């Protein structure tokens, strides 16, 4: 997903990210924002379809989805994540279609799908704890015991001396080139200061939403695209078992770290978060959609062994 300059977005980001010591932030794109054409645009914006996220998804629902994130004993990011930070971040991406595409059910499904990735990647729970793993999303905001610095040779985004690029954020970001790429998009110097993602929850959510809304490579779909149905698979995609649905979002986000490996635990766990959140949000897992898994899918972007996170 490309994004052209938005004055309102720039102003909003400057205000909400004032705590991060960096220059003004605006999202840029060569691609026009999607204009609603179904008669359900939000008041005041022809780009915002149906309800805004804050009307669809309220604070009590956020608390239902992430009830243990501030647990005194087990949570590692107590008092970091909150509803306000999520809504503030989402307001930047709503005009681009994030959870504002389609009718209300699709909007709720996309929220559940995105937050399922967040919950699965940040949980500190297991089947033995109160509520199971699904109650413990947003327990972390960074990788606790990094096994490496995640520094790779890259001409555009070279590693900064003394900086480690381990996982941080709502959907953890790894590797110097990913911090550089996301930082460029958000106009934040994440290459020199990746720690911003564990210091500012709004920025951490924005980085996750940017990953959701943005293709890894040109001429590929984003996770948003494959989920809401705006992507049409080619013959090669079909032969690679890549079809629209929640399964393809895992393919785009994680590639062959999860997909094409059969029904492995990490894939099944992410699906279980999605279905659990659908239930909590009143949609119901019976509306999970087709092509839930990526067990047989070939990766859009096969990973190099040294880049595995």
Which role fits each region the language model picked out?
Residues 1-3, 97:
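Helix-loop boundary elements of multi-pass alpha-helical membrane proteins
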Residues 4-24:
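Cleavable N-terminal signal peptides of Sec/SRP-targeted secreted and luminal proteins
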Residues 25-309:
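Folded extracytoplasmic luminal domains of secretory or organellar precursors
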């Amino acid at each position: 997903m490309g994004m052209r300059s938005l004055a309102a977005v720039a102003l909003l980001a400057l205000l909400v990210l004032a705590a991060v010591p960096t220059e003004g932030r605006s999202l840029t794109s060569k691609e026009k924002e999607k204009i609603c054409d179904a008669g359900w645009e939000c008041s005041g914006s022809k780009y915002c379809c149906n309800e805004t996220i804050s009307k669809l998804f309220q604070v009590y629902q956020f608390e239902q989805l992430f009830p243990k994130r501030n647990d005194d004993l087990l949570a590692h990011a107590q008092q970091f994540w909150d509803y306000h930070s999520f809504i503030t971040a989402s307001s930047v991406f709503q005009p681009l279609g994030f959870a504002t595409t389609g009718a209300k059910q699709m909007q709720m499904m996309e929220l559940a799908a995105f937050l399922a990735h967040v919950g699965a990647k940040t949980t500190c729970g297991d089947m033995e704890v109160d509520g199971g793993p699904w109650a413990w999303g947003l327990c972390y905001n960074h990788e606790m015991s990094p096994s490496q610095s995640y520094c790779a040779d890259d001409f555009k985004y070279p590693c900064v001396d003394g900086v480690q690029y381990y996982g941080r954020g709502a959907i953890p970001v790894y590797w110097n080139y990913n911090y550089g790429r996301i930082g460029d998009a958000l106009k934040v110097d994440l290459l020199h200061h990746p720690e911003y993602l564990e210091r500012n929850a709004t920025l951490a959510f924005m980085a996750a939403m940017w990953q959701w809304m943005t293709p890894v490579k040109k001429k590929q779909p984003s996770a948003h695209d494959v989920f809401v149905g705006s992507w049409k698979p080619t013959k090669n995609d079909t032969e690679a078992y890549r079809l629209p649905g929640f399964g393809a979002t895992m393919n785009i986000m994680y590639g062959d770290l999860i997909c094409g490996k059969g029904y492995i635990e990490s894939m099944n766990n992410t699906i279980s978060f999605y279905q659990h959140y659908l239930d909590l949000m009143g949609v119901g897992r019976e509306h999970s959609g087709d092509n839930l898994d990526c067990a047989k899918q070939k990766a859009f972007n096969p990973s190099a062994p040294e880049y595995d996170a």
